């Protein structure tokens, strides 16, 4: 069994040297991701495709490989195929017939062939021959070239016949690390998650800068979003997560800055700080989730004033998107449930925000800040490899707080998102299971019976550890992590 990875069309249009570089990078990225699934994964680059071989003794890996390939930037689509050899067109038909005989009963069908290499036949001739044979020697209703019930997809490469069993749509975009790095300002809401994803998809290693305005719970939530985006779409490369304690800035804004200018000043301080951090990391651009007119600080006038605080390029991929489109995209990429539970702090600090800030007035207000304020918060910022988010949780959740077996008096809480829980329901005989999504756990845990011990469960164990850590920090001692 193999997967044939088709390159995104924009890659195919590049010059030969660029196309070669992009294809090599995509091959490396695929190998880096799939090696984490299975060390025996084999990836082979060709001029216009990449072949991924599933180990013959591990056919069960096909689903995991397919799921990972669907989330790697630079891929148009992936076809899962079974491989055969052939000597003639009739030989092709004879191998297709037993595979599709039962499937075609009572169905309309057509045959589609893609061919590369030198042969004494063309693709249309194969389609006609195989289609005619299937129509005659199966119980199919007949051939229908438009909107058939079943399409028999075949790919012929020299002496190899690939029978397509499944097609998986890819992300598109460019392979990771074919573009320069960016630093994304992430708050955990709908916008910043989607804007970060857009640049991952575009092939830029996306590092994360978080301005902490809401304490430990806010940071834990944002780390969950960043880790999800990296683990799902950018796992082939290392990135950094920078947490900046921004409460001192907010405190000075509330004490010293004119009420109408607060929102714009806060954003300018964030951009200044992020630009300093980006410069230290050798990064040339910032990414934000701002969308034109969505809030008062995002008018054209205010965005122009915000941009004047730094010479660094500020990229806004969502600038013309409607809010509902952003929410729909967050649902598609898996960040919607995180965003629903994330508090919004930036919009509440100004009661009458200006929509037409004047640069001179804003700069005059900013002179009221302490001289070394940005230096102080940068010095207190914490930079970690994003992989350490999971590792830190492993270290801070002790062995006594992680269990693999369950006592009858313990209760398991499935904290997965509703869609994930429905697709793979957790069932443990004789054990009570409560279903509380992670984004509701912080508010609902206090209502549970304090005499019982609760074991948090999620698929990968990262989110359950983050949530357990937060609850423990809040003083709860009756919570552990369940890792079967």
From Swiss-Prot:
SUPFAM superfamilies: Adenine nucleotide alpha hydrolases-like, Rhodanese/Cell cycle control phosphatase, THUMP domain-like
Keyword terms, alphabetized: ATP-binding, Cytoplasm, Disulfide bond, Nucleotide-binding, Redox-active center, RNA-binding, Thiamine biosynthesis, Transferase, tRNA-binding
Magnesium keyword on record: no
Pfam family of the protein (one): THUMP
Reaction it catalyzes: [ThiI sulfur-carrier protein]-S-sulfanyl-L-cysteine + a uridine in tRNA + 2 reduced [2Fe-2S]-[ferredoxin] + ATP + H(+) = [ThiI sulfur-carrier protein]-L-cysteine + a 4-thiouridine in tRNA + 2 oxidized [2Fe-2S]-[ferredoxin] + AMP + diphosphate; [ThiS sulfur-carrier protein]-C-terminal Gly-Gly-AMP + S-sulfanyl-L-cysteinyl-[cysteine desulfurase] + AH2 = [ThiS sulfur-carrier protein]-C-terminal-Gly-aminoethanethioate + L-cysteinyl-[cysteine desulfurase] + A + AMP + 2 H(+)
Binding residues annotated for ATP, in chain numbering: 185-186, 267, 289, 298
Domain of life: Bacteria
Location of the THUMP domain: 63-167
Residues covered by the Rhodanese domain: 406-484
Residues the record marks as active site: 458 (cysteine persulfide intermediate)
Cellular component per GO, a single term: cytosol
EC number assigned by the record: 2.8.1.4
InterPro entries given in the database record: Rhodanese-like_dom, Rhodanese-like_dom_sf, Rossmann-like_a/b/a_fold, ThiI_AANH, ThiI_fer, ThiI_N, THII_Thiazole_biosynth_dom, THUMP_dom
Coiled-coil ranges from the UniProt annotation: none
S-S bridge residues: 346-458
Family: Belongs to the ThiI family.
Function description: Catalyzes the ATP-dependent transfer of a sulfur to tRNA to produce 4-thiouridine in position 8 of tRNAs, which functions as a near-UV photosensor. Also catalyzes the transfer of sulfur to the sulfur carrier protein ThiS, forming ThiS-thiocarboxylate. This is a step in the synthesis of thiazole, in the thiamine biosynthesis pathway. The sulfur is donated as persulfide by IscS.
Full protein name: tRNA sulfurtransferase
Species for this entry: Shewanella baltica (strain OS155 / ATCC BAA-1091)
């Amino acid at each position: 069994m193999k997967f044939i990875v088709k390159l995104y069309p924009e890659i195919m249009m590049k010059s030969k040297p660029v196309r070669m570089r992009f294809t090599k990078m995509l091959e490396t990225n695929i190998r880096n991701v799939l090696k984490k699934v299975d060390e025996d994964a084999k990836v082979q680059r060709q001029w216009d495709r990449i072949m991924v071989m599933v180990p013959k003794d591990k056919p069960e890996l096909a689903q995991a490989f397919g799921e990972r390939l669907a989330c790697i930037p630079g891929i148009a689509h992936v076809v899962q195929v079974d491989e055969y050899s052939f000597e003639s067109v009739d030989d092709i038909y004879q191998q297709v017939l037993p595979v599709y005989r039962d499937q075609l009963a009572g169905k309309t069908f057509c045959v589609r062939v893609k061919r590369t290499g030198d042969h004494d036949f063309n693709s249309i001739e194969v389609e006609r021959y195989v289609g005619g044979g299937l129509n005659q020697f199966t119980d199919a209703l007949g051939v229908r070239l438009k909107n058939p019930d079943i399409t028999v997809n075949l790919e012929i490469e020299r002496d190899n016949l690939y029978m397509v069993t499944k097609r998986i749509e890819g992300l598109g975009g460019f392979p990771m690390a074919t573009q320069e790095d960016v630093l994304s300002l992430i708050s955990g809401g709908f916008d910043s998650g989607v804007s970060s994803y857009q640049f991952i998809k575009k092939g830029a290693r996306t590092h994360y800068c978080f301005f902490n305005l809401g304490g430990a719970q806010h940071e834990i939530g944002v780390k969950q979003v960043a880790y999800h985006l990296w683990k799902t779409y950018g796992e082939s490369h290392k990135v950094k997560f920078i947490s900046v304690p921004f409460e001192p800035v907010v405190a000075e804004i509330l004490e010293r800055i004119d009420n109408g200018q607060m929102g714009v000043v806060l954003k300018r301080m964030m951009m200044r700080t992020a630009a300093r951090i980006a410069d230290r990391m050798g990064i040339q651009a910032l990414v934000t989730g701002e969308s034109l007119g969505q809030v008062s600080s995002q008018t054209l006038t205010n965005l122009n004033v915000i941009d004047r605080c730094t010479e660094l390029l500020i990229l806004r991929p969502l600038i013309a998107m409607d809010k509902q489109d952003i929410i729909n995209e967050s649902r598609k990429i898996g960040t919607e449930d995180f965003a629903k539970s994330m508090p919004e702090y930036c919009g509440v600090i100004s009661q009458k925000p200006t929509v037409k800030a004047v640069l001179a007035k804003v700069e005059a207000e900013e002179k009221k800040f302490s001289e070394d304020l940005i230096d102080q918060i940068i010095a207190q910022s914490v930079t970690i490899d994003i992989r350490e988010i999971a590792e830190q949780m492993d270290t801070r959740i002790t062995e006594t707080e992680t269990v693999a077996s369950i006592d009858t008096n313990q209760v398991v809480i499935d904290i997965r998102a509703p869609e994930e829980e429905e697709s793979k329901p957790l069932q443990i005989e004789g054990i009570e299971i409560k279903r509380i999504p992670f984004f509701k756990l912080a508010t609902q845990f206090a209502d549970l019976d304090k005499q019982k011990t609760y074991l948090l469960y999620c698929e990968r164990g990262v989110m359950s550890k983050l949530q357990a850590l937060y609850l423990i920090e809040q003083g709860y001692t009756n919570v552990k992590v369940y890792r079967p």
